[in-house]
Structure formats: C-alpha cells, structure tokens
C-alpha cells in the first residue's frame, strides 16, 4: 500500500479527510505538485496536439490531473478527474489557478474569500456535473477512438470505449500491457504511448 507520512494515499485523497483535515489534504497535493514541477510533456503528448491540429473534430478525454496535456498545447480537452493546479472554492464553487508551490497556506477564493480545495475528484466523490455526459457524447460521435495508457478499471470513464464501439467507432488501444478492454479493441498496440503515438503519427498521419 502506498503511504505518505504513514497515511494511505486513498485516505489522503478522500472527500472525508477534506472535510476533517483540509490542511493535510492540501499538504499531500502540494507534495504531488512539487514532484510534477520536474516533469514535462513527452512525445506522446505532442503527438496528440498534432492530431488535434489536423482534425477538426477532435476531443481529448483524460483522467490525468497533471496538466501535461494542456502544457503540451491541447485545447479541446476534457479533464474528467480535474486538474491538480486548479482550486475550487468550498463556498461558491468558483475555480481558479493555484500554481504556487510550496504553498504557504490553504488557498482562498478570489471571489468570496472562503477556503478552497484542490479541483480534483477525490475518493468518495462523483465526477463534476456534466463532464462525463460531454465525454460520452464525444465518444459516441467518434469514428476513431484511442484508449491510451489506462488500466481501464476506473469507472465510469472505463465505459467510454464501450460507448464508442457500440456507436460504430474503431477502437485502438495503446498500452504497455493487455487490459480489460483489450477484447473489444480492433487493434491493441503494446508499448509506451510516448513511443507508439509519434510513430503512429509519422506512419499514418
């Protein structure tokens, strides 16, 4: 079990701890943000940006909260689990950028002054209203649906390839190993996204 300061990460990233000890939750997420400052987008991120430039109807649906897709230049982006560099007010629900790290104190809302929380989906919470519906609509409209670097076990997002397939899309999986959705993929490309996507772009455009 992965722990930090002796606490399971599932507890540190939980809605329950956000209610009882928001300062500790922020300290945990600030630790994670500090690690992310050393990470930059890879060739796979940039390949997706290039696809977006080439195709008018392109939607990138991500469960990642690290902001690397946006840093690479992706525009039509649905962050279904939120963004670790954004905060959301606990009173008025306004969202705002919160990029200072390390944090000196818990961020407060620029609108009403109340305390804020990380704008991410915590354990024990539902997805933000409307975000999955938009993702599912994009999946059902797709002619080609890539499933990239996911274990395909976190629902409801893991159901999106099924929705795309049922609507007639061709599904291509890119992953280091087989997953629970490999059986429905038309093609499974085994390997790292940072290596496979640029090569796929070069060969197929």
What does each of the following model-derived ranges do?
Residues 1-205:
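Conserved catalytic core of sirtuin-type NAD+-dependent deacylases
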């Amino acid at each position: 079990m992965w722990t930090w300061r002796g606490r399971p990460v599932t507890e540190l990233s939980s809605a329950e701890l956000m209610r009882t000890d928001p300062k500790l939750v922020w300290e945990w997420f600030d630790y994670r943000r500090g690690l992310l400052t050393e990470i930059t987008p890879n060739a796979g991120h940039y390949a997706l940006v290039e696809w977006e430039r080439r195709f008018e109807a392109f939607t990138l649906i991500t469960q990642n909260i690290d902001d690397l897709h946006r840093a690479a230049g992706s525009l039509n982006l649905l962050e279904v689990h939120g963004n670790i560099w954004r905060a959301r007010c606990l009173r008025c629900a306004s969202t705002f950028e919160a990029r200072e790290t390390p944090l000196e104190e818990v961020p407060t809302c620029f609108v009403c002054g109340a305390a804020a929380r990380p704008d991410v989906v915590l354990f024990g919470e539902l997805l933000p209203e409307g975000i999955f519906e938009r993702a599912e609509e994009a999946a059902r409209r797709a002619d080609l649906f890539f499933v990239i670097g996911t274990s395909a076990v976190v629902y409801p997002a893991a159901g999106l390839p099924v929705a795309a397939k049922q609507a007639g899309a061709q599904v291509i999986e890119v992953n280091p190993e087989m997953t629970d959705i490999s059986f429905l993929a038309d093609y499974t490309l085994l390997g790292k996204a940072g290596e496979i996507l640029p090569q796929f772009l070069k060969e197929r455009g």
